[in-house]
Curated annotation (Swiss-Prot):
One of its GO terms (biological process) is cell division. Belongs to the cyclin family. Cyclin D subfamily. PROSITE patterns: CYCLINS. The gene is CYCD5-2. This is Cyclin-D5-2. InterPro entries: Cyclin, Cyclin-like_dom, Cyclin-like_sf, Cyclin_C-dom, Cyclin_N, Cyclins_cyclin-box.
């Protein structure tokens, strides 16, 4: 991919991609039955606790929605990349994995820097993976092209999710790299066009509140979602976040459906010690009684999460700490940045106050 491919978009670089709306047209959150299904569904844990049928309907709708964004299980980003020449040169093809890992780490660090929500970071990683599945990035252009792509993906995700997104000049590319706002905006447009302007993908965070609440309720004999039960479910969901981002670092987020990742993360965060396949399938019935989630894929994803956790425990002399004395047992870039408090994390809503430090990058070309 070269910058020339984006030149056709240069005429549009004088405008902002941020939608100028104040939310007045959203009403009281009531969704018109005539909507085409592109609106996001929101999970109300307290209401759903009293109506498991409604809860299951929510999961069913989210699973159906995620299907349109998922990659075929037989097609991996890394397999496709290798087949498109990403593995040429040194014989092992690790350079693309390393470039992607650096991009994901930068995205997670940027999430912590600006105080973005978890969903924003995950969407940015998903945009990056989807883009690389459709377009080839030349090795000679790495790592600057991957960093420019990372900035564009985070910027678009922030415009999708945050109440206020940073100005393009606020993003610190790191490593002495400097990108002008026009270059970032052109890359944003290239990302949008490459992904067909379909940016509202489902993420594991759309399932976490529901899954953690259901698992806690069944585990404690039908305890309600209020009070101590809600706090306990929120703690499990918070710990699951670390597993989700550790998995995102380890491989493409397109390899597993968001519902699969969410289920595996909740189970890993809830039980820690490896469960047998039979025990895992038994626990899964509490998450989705109608078997909407593929058990084989959940088991594979869960095994990877727990395996990485055990490997990290053996290689680390002390656990990593995060805010509010909560420990994330996986070792990933996510662990080194501050997480939101438990209440905000359980809600998985963008924080109303975007706590933003303002970097001062050098003058850009």
């Amino acid at each position: 991919m070269s910058m020339e491919e984006a030149e056709e978009c240069s005429a549009a670089c004088g405008f902002s991609l941020t939608c100028q709306e104040d939310g007045a047209d959203l009403g009281d959150g009531v969704v018109d039955d005539d909507d085409d299904g592109d609106v996001f569904l929101f999970y109300n844990a307290v209401a759903a606790a009293d109506d498991e049928e409604e809860e299951e309907e929510y999961v069913e709708q989210m699973v159906s929605k995620e299907a349109s964004f998922c990659c075929s299980s037989s097609s991996s980003l890394f397999d496709a990349a290798a087949g498109d020449g990403y593995g040429d040169g040194d014989g092992d093809g690790d350079w693309f994995r390393q470039a992607r890992l650096a991009a994901v780490k930068w995205i997670l660090e940027t999430r912590g820097y600006f105080g973005f929500g978890h969903r924003t970071a995950y969407l940015a990683i998903a945009y990056f993976d989807r883009f690389c599945l459709r377009r080839r990035v030349d090795r000679e252009a790495m790592p600057w092209a991957a960093r420019l792509l990372s900035i564009a993906c985070v910027s678009v995700a922030a415009k999708m999710e945050e109440y206020q997104s940073p100005a393009l000049s606020e993003f610190d590319a790191g490593g002495g790299r400097v990108f002008c706002s026009d270059s970032i905006r052109r890359m944003e447009l290239l990302v949008l066009s490459t992904l067909g302007w379909r940016m509202g993908a489902v993420t594991p965070f759309d399932f976490l509140p529901c899954f953690s609440s259901r698992l806690h309720r069944h585990h404690h004999g039908g305890a309600g979602a209020a009070g101590h039960g809600a706090a306990a479910a929120a703690r499990v969901a918070l710990n699951a976040v670390g597993f989700i981002f550790a998995t995102a670092e380890a491989g493409s987020v397109l390899d597993y459906r968001p519902s699969t990742v969410a289920a595996a993360a909740i189970l890993a965060a809830s039980y820690g010690a490896p469960l047998t396949k039979e025990a895992l399938e038994s626990k899964m019935s509490n998450l989705s009684p109608s078997c909407l989630i593929d058990k084989e894929n959940v088991h594979a994803c869960y095994s990877m999460m727990v395996g990485d956790m055990n490997n990290n425990r053996r290689s680390s002399k002390r656990p990593l700490q995060c805010s509010d004395s909560n420990e994330i047992t996986t070792t990933s870039t996510y662990d080194s940045v501050l997480v939101d408090d438990v209440t905000d994390t359980a809600a998985f809503a963008a924080t109303a106050m975007n706590k933003r430090l303002r970097p001062e990058p050098p003058r850009i070309r």
